């Protein structure tokens, strides 16, 4: 055991998993925060069609440039789509890669009867759903950026028969994001020290489900 051997040992440490973990957590946090903001902005329709109209025009730059530039919406959607791909690539290394692995995972999850393990399984399932449905939604936003507003969005939802997709997407993204933030807080030790960690975790779980239910 000498300085040279220790230096060689350090040089052989594979830091890629740690970096991928960091990328996964950071991109997931960014996507979850974006989703919360997105849901609050979309809910402007509850204040009336004029409120949602002004929100849509704001993101087209009307109040900055004096005229709408739907390309700004395309750029935002493309950036979110790229971030989603980065997050998916970083997370996929932890997901089962075959039917046999999924079956084994489900069997172990049932035998463990551990709530947080079930949450991870739900996150895997909702992640698979989001890989398809979120891509469809973002592609629509990128290719039809001017069709966002109280009338256009309602027409797409009803006449375009997109409501089943958006309904499944809503539940999937809220479950995935809420569980992800809960697990992120636990993983990186962001909770303050407590004399009763179990009670603290239960409070965090209740907070997570309350926020998910709110959105």
Q: Where do the PLM segments sit?
A:
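Membrane-embedded alpha-helical bundles that constitute the cytochrome b-like, heme-associated redox core
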Residues: 1-215
């Amino acid at each position: 055991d000498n300085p040279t051997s220790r230096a060689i040992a350090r040089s052989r440490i594979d830091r890629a998993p740690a970096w991928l973990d960091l990328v996964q957590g950071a991109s997931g946090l960014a996507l979850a925060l974006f989703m919360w903001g997105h849901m609050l902005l979309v809910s402007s329709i509850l204040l009336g069609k004029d409120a949602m109209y002004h929100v849509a025009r704001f993101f087209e730059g009307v109040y900055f440039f004096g005229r709408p530039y739907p390309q700004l919406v395309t750029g935002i959607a493309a950036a979110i789509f790229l971030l989603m791909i980065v997050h998916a690539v970083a997370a996929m290394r932890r997901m089962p890669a075959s039917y046999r692995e999924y079956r084994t995972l489900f069997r172990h999850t049932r035998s463990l009867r551990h709530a947080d393990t079930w949450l991870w399984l739900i996150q895997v399932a909702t992640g698979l759903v989001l890989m398809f449905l979120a891509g469809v939604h973002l592609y629509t936003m990128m290719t039809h950026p001017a069709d966002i507003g109280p009338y256009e969005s309602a027409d797409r939802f009803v006449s375009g028969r997109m409501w089943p997709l958006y309904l499944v997407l809503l539940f999937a993204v809220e479950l995935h994001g809420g569980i992800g933030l809960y697990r992120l807080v636990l993983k990186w030790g962001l909770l303050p020290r407590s004399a009763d960690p179990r009670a603290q975790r239960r409070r965090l779980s209740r907070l997570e489900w309350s926020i998910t239910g709110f959105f």
